[in-house]
UniProtKB/Swiss-Prot annotation:
Organism listed in the record: Danio rerio
Matches recorded under Gene3D superfamilies: CAP Gly-rich-like domain, Phosphatidylinositol 3-kinase Catalytic Subunit, Chain A, domain 1, Ribonuclease Inhibitor
Domain of life: Eukaryota
Major subcellular site: cytoplasm
PROSITE patterns listed in its UniProt record: CAP_GLY_1, CAP_GLY_2
PANTHER family, sorted: NISCHARIN RELATED, PROTEIN PHOSPHATASE 1 REGULATORY SUBUNIT 7-RELATED
Family designation: Belongs to the TBCE family.
Alphabetical keyword list: Chaperone, Cytoplasm, Cytoskeleton, Leucine-rich repeat, Repeat
Protein name (record): Tubulin-specific chaperone E
Assembly and interaction partners: Supercomplex made of cofactors A to E. Cofactors A and D function by capturing and stabilizing tubulin in a quasi-native conformation. Cofactor E binds to the cofactor D-tubulin complex; interaction with cofactor C then causes the release of tubulin polypeptides that are committed to the native state.
Length: 521
C-alpha cells in the first residue's frame, strides 16, 4: 500500500488500534510520520497539534499521536488471517501419528477430524482481533469459505462499510455478523451495499462509537436484520426509525447514556420482542396514551425488557410497565427502587404483585405459589391505605379515590381475585429499620409437650433453611428432618405449612407474635 493512500486506514501498533488522520513530515524531525487518532484516548498524547501546528483533529484532547510507518501494521486480508488462524489449528489437531517413548502410535479417526476441520467446510469463522483489513484477491473468500453462516470480525482493522461489504458479498449464506470494536467510516450510499448483507439476521456492532443517527443512516444496508446489538456506543438520543429496522425482534442499547424522553421513539417497532436498556441512566418511563390499569398500544410485541443498573427509584415506573401488553420477562436489578423496601425479597414480591403478566423476574421464574403469596401479601400491605382512600369490603360501597388507584392500579383486580383482606390481616408498611424487621416468634413442639416454648426475635428476611438450622441447635436435634407450620392470632384454628426452605419467613406472611410449630419424625 502506498502511504499517500493511508489516510482513513486503520492501523495497529503495540496492540492498540487507531485511524490514520495524517501522513507527512512533522518538523523539525526528518522523514514521514503517521498521525493516528487512537480508539482509546489514553494511548495518545495530544489532539493532533504539535509545536503550535495542527496536523489533524481528534475527538479527544489526548487521542492522537505520531508514529513511524514501519511501527504500524495495516493488517492482512481475510484469507491470510483465516489461514493463520485455522491452518495452524488443523496442523496441530490432525497429525496422523505421534511419537510416544520412541514408538509410533497411530491416531485412529483423525482423518475424519481433519475433514471436519477443513477450512472450506466451516460454517462459523472467528477472526476476532486478527488484524483483518481487506478482502484479498477477487472471489478468493467465496472459494475458500463458501458455507460460512456466522462470522466474527470484532476488533479488526476494517476501515469502512465498503471494505466490509467486499468481504460479506462473497459469503452467500452469512446470517450472523459480529463487528464490535471496529471503527467503520459511514457509507455515503448505504442502500447500494444492501446486497452484501441480504441474508443477515444478527448484527453485533457494540463499541463502534456510533450515534443513533448513524445507525439509522446505515440501516438500509441490513433491512432483514432481526437482532441488533448496539451496546456501549455514542447513542445519546433516539429518533423514530422510518422504513428501517422494521424486522427487529431484539435490540440492545445498553451502556448508552440515552435521553429518557426519547425512548418512546422506538416504541412503534412492530416486531420488537426483547429490548435491553440496562445502564442507560433511565429513571422514568411513561405511557401517556392510556390511564393506569389499561394497556398501551406502544411496544405491542415487547416480551422481554432489561432495565438493570439504572436510576429507577419510584414504584410508579413499575406501574407504567404493567401497561405493556405482552411483557412477561423483566430484569430490574441494581436500581435504587429495590433499596426502598426492607430487603430485596420484599421488593421482588411487590414487583410481582404490580406486574400481573410477569413470568420471569431478574432471571428467576415466578411460580404460581410465589405469585399467590406475593399478591396476598400486597393486599394486606396496602389494605389500610385502600380503606382510607374510600375502599370498602362491600362491592357497592368500594370506591377508592384516583390517587390510590394511580398508585395501586392492580389493587381492585387483586381483591376481586382473592377477596378483600380482613381487618385483622391489615398491616402497614413500616419504615426501613432493623427493629421493624425483627419478628418475635414463639416455637412450639406440639408432639413433645415436655419441651418448653422458645421465644426468639428473627428477621422476616431469614430463609426457612436457616430457621431450621437454628432449631437443630436449640432443640439439639442434629440431622433430623423438621416440618414447620405456623399459626397466628387472626386464624388461631388454622395451621399454615412452611414448605419451601429457600423462601424467607415474610413470604409466608409470618408476623410479629406468631407461633411456629415444629415437628419431626
Amino acid at each position: 500500500m502506498m502511504l499517500d493512500e493511508a489516510v482513513g486506514r486503520r492501523v495497529c501498533c503495540d496492540g492498540e488500534r487507531g485511524t490514520v488522520r495524517y501522513v507527512g513530515p512533522v518538523p523539525p524531525t526528518a522523514g514521514v510520520w503517521l498521525g493516528v487518532e487512537w480508539d482509546h484516548p489514553e494511548r495518545g498524547k495530544h489532539d493532533g497539534s504539535h509545536d503550535g501546528v495542527r496536523y489533524f483533529t481528534c475527538r479527544h484532547p489526548t487521542g492522537g499521536s505520531f508514529v513511524r510507518p514501519q511501527k504500524a501494521s495495516f493488517g492482512v486480508d481475510y484469507v491470510t488471517a483465516l489461514k493463520q488462524r485455522y491452518e495452524v489449528e488443523i496442523e496441530e489437531v490432525t497429525a496422523e501419528e505421534m511419537k510416544i517413548s520412541s514408538k509410533t502410535v497411530v491416531m485412529v479417526g483423525f482423518e475424519n477430524v481433519k475433514k471436519k476441520q477443513s477450512v472450506k467446510n466451516l460454517t462459523e469463522v472467528g477472526l476476532r482481533r486478527c488484524e483483518v483489513s481487506a478482502p484479498g484477491p477477487e472471489n478468493e473468500i467465496r472459494n475458500t469459505t463458501p458455507f460460512v453462516q456466522s462470522l466474527d470480525l470484532s476488533g479488526n482493522l476494517l476501515s469502512s462499510w465498503e471494505v466490509l461489504a467486499a468481504i460479506t458479498e462473497q459469503l452467500d449464506s452469512l446470517q450472523e455478523l459480529h463487528l464490535s470494536h471496529n471503527r467503520l467510516s459511514i457509507s455515503s450510499a448505504p442502500s447500494s451495499l444492501s446486497s452484501a448483507f441480504s441474508h443477515l439476521r444478527v448484527l453485533s456492532i457494540n463499541s463502534c462509537a456510533l450515534t443513533w443517527t448513524q445507525v439509522l443512516h446505515c440501516a438500509p444496508m441490513w433491512q432483514q436484520v432481526e437482532e441488533l446489538y448496539l451496546a456501549d456506543n455514542n447513542i445519546t438520543e433516539l429518533l423514530r426509525p422510518e422504513h428501517v429496522l422494521q424486522a427487529l425482534t431484539v435490540l440492545d442499547l445498553s451502556n448508552n447514556q440515552i435521553a429518557q424522553e426519547t425512548v418512546l421513539e422506538i416504541s412503534h417497532l412492530p416486531r420488537l420482542e426483547r429490548l435491553n436498556l440496562s445502564s442507560t441512566s433511565l429513571s422514568e418511563i411513561k405511557f401517556s396514551d392510556v390511564p393506569a390499569g389499561k394497556k398501551t398500544t406502544l411496544f405491542p410485541a415487547l416480551k422481554e425488557l432489561l432495565l438493570d443498573d439504572n436510576n429507577i427509584s419510584e414504584w410508579r415506573v413499575v406501574n407504567e410497565l404493567e401497561k405493556l401488553p405482552s411483557l412477561v420477562y423483566l430484569s430490574c436489578r441494581r436500581n435504587p427502587l429495590l433499596h426502598k423496601e426492607k430487603n430485596l425479597e420484599t421488593a421482588r414480591q411487590i414487583m410481582i404483585a404490580r406486574l400481573g403478566q410477569l413470568e420471569l423476574l431478574d432471571m428467576r421464574q415466578i411460580l404460581s405459589d410465589e405469585r399467590r403469596g406475593a399478591e396476598l401479601d400486597y393486599c394486606k400491605m396496602f389494605g389500610s391505605a385502600w380503606l382510607r382512600a374510600g375502599g370498602h369490603r362491600e362491592a357497592e360501597k368500594n370506591n377508592p379515590n384516583t390517587d390510590f388507584m394511580t398508585e395501586h392500579p392492580r389493587y381492585l383486580t387483586l381483591i376481586q381475585k382473592y377477596g378483600a383482606p380482613d381487618e385483622g390481616e391489615l398491616r402497614e408498611q413500616k419504615p426501613f429499620a432493623l427493629k421493624n424487621q425483627l419478628l418475635t416468634i414463639t416455637f412450639l413442639c406440639p408432639e413433645d409437650l415436655e419441651r418448653k416454648p422458645i421465644e426468639k426475635k428473627l428477621p422476616g428476611s431469614m430463609i426457612v433453611q436457616k430457621v431450621k438450622g437454628l432449631l437443630h441447635r436449640l432443640l439439639k436435634l442434629p440431622g433430623v428432618e423438621l416440618k414447620l407450620t405456623y399459626t397466628c392470632a387472626k386464624m388461631a384454628d388454622r395451621e399454615i405449612e412452611i414448605d419451601n426452605d429457600l423462601k424467607p419467613l415474610q413470604f409466608y406472611s409470618v408476623e410479629d407474635g406468631d407461633k411456629i410449630l415444629v415437628r419431626w419424625s
